[in-house]
Curated annotation (Swiss-Prot):
It is found in: Periplasm. InterPro entries: DiS-bond_Isoase_DsbC/G, DiS-bond_isomerase_DsbC/G_N, DiS-bond_isomerase_DsbC/G_N_sf, Thiol:disulfide_interchange, Thioredoxin-like_fold, Thioredoxin-like_sf, Thioredoxin_CS. Residues 1-31 form the signal peptide. Belongs to the thioredoxin family. DsbC subfamily. One of its GO terms (cellular component) is periplasmic space. Keywords: Disulfide bond, Periplasm, Redox-active center, Signal. This is Probable thiol:disulfide interchange protein DsbC. Residues 33-74 are annotated as: Disordered. Disulfide bonds join 174-177, 213-236. It comes from the Bacteria. Required for disulfide bond formation in some periplasmic proteins. Acts by transferring its disulfide bond to other proteins and is reduced in the process.
Amino acid sequence: MSGPPFSGAGMNFRITVWCAAAAVWSSGALAQDGAGQAAPGTPDKVYSTTGTAPAKPGDKVYSTRSAQAPDPQADAVKERFAQRFEGFDVTAVRRTPYGLFEVQIGTDLLYTDEKVTWVMEGPLIDALTRRDVTRERQEKLSSVPFDELPLDLAVKQVKGDGSRVMAVFEDPNCGYCKQLHRTLEDMDNITVYTFLYPILSPDSTTKVRDIWCASDPAKVWKDWMVRGQRPPTAECDAPVEQWLALGRQLMVRGTPAIFFKSGGRVSGALPRDELEARL
């Protein structure tokens, strides 16, 4: 999948951990230490992870914060984490049944002890069942009720009886999105809702406008993504800002981002067998 670098996890987090460790060491504590296309730059934080700040009046907000009972100890860990690592937007901290605290930063997860002396970047594996606990938690935290998606803002394509449904955030300049379309060409009885998501280049915004404003957006979209036929120029009031706001609210950091009827989501172009299994 492609997406802008996320400052809360991965290599950027590890670098920050080591920088913070040098400062924390003097006070007696040491801190130690995710297939798509990346959008340039870090996304502006217009979205909300708490469900309280719509991008603009009337917008529906999707939250990645699950309801939980008050936990003073977890709150204290969150405060300590913020002190250790300034600039990280911590969504929530939760106590786990395996003696650690789960630190949620958007849809990314880290683990720490009560005093935030050590920080571990997943995945966390259950040694008895071999389950990837981190991945399971991320899927749960990032799930979105499919019926709540504003499908009227999507380009709709139907093949066969259209009984299997999915929604995808795509940039017209995304190579992995085009790979996904080649996979979909070999599948039947499917409905695909595409949210045009121009994050890769200024030219992406022009293309999504031409596609959305065409007399047959679904045909023009397929012609471009599958056949490479550039969309003819078209003018209308395309909902570009609404697409971008929706993506931020859902924490879509790259394309393609696939949402399934079950509420699950996947980042990147899945091979056909995995896609069939999820549909």
